[in-house]
């Protein structure tokens, strides 16, 4: 008789991406994407809590890579032709050179995306610890990693010009709060606090940098 303890039991109706072996890779990816966009609460409920860190990481990398690729293609296909003639002459050679950089960026992007997802999950997990959101958690760090990776479906909103990045940030916050609440079995208040701490710190840090840079410029020009 085997003495190896049984692994985590997957949900009876698993997330499509977590059953991609039977559903097919492409179909499972887009079914999961659609579920997170249209019925996120159901997606979080159907998600397993432990036993598979590969699936969320692969999904997060794939959806971020897709967003990066589409943004780059749209900029080159739509943005560059709309430039005035004098700017087109100035940036024409740069655009050709930039195409090569873009190709290299797409090749290397999965590595950097995966690293960023792990760092983001670690930061969020520490914030969950600070606010006491892990008291009833059975998933530990894996739950935080899942919340971060699957919430990256929001990055697709950044494809939309001007307002897209802001929508993506707000959407990510909403999804991450739902994910933390579900996967760590915590209250909505603690989930909101855990998610907003790094967001507020990042925004505050960015504003501080801008203020310091602005003050330095004013001081420099004030002496002339």
Language-model regions: role of each:
Residues 59, 63, 67, 113-117, ...:
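Hydrophobic alpha-helical membrane-embedded or membrane-associated segments
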Residues 97, 103-108, 120-207:
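Hydrophobic alpha-helical transmembrane segments and adjacent short intramembrane/lumenal linkers
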Residues 70-113, 155-168, 202-224:
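Membrane-helix interface segments in multi-pass membrane proteins
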Residues 46-50, 91-99, 184-185:
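Helix-boundary and loop/linker segments of multi-pass membrane transporters
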Residues 39, 44, 80-81, 125-131:
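Hydrophobic transmembrane alpha-helix segments characteristic of membrane transport
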Residues 1-66, 70:
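N-terminal juxtamembrane cytosolic/stromal segments of multi-pass membrane proteins
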């Amino acid at each position: 008789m085997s003495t190896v303890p049984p692994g985590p039991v997957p949900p009876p109706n698993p997330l499509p991406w977590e059953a991609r072996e039977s559903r097919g890779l492409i179909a499972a990816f887009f079914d999961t994407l659609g579920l997170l966009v249209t019925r996120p609460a159901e997606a979080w409920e159907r998600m397993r809590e432990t036993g598979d860190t590969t699936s969320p990481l692969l999904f997060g990398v794939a959806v971020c890579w897709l967003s990066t690729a589409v943004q780059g293609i749209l900029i080159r296909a739509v943005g560059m032709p709309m430039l005035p003639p004098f700017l087109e002459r100035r940036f024409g050679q740069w655009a050709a050179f930039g195409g090569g950089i873009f190709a290299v960026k797409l090749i290397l992007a999965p590595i950097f995306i995966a690293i960023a997802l792990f760092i983001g999950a670690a930061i969020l997990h520490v914030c969950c610890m600070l606010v006491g959101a892990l008291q009833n958690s059975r998933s530990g760090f894996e739950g935080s990693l899942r919340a971060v990776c699957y919430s990256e479906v929001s990055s697709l909103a950044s494809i939309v010009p001007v307002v897209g990045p802001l929508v993506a940030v707000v959407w990510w916050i909403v999804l991450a709060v739902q994910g933390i609440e579900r996967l760590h079995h915590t209250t909505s208040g603690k989930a909101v606090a855990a998610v907003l701490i790094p967001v507020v710190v990042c925004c505050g840090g960015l504003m501080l940098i801008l203020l310091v840079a602005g003050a330095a410029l004013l001081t420099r020009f004030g002496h002339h």
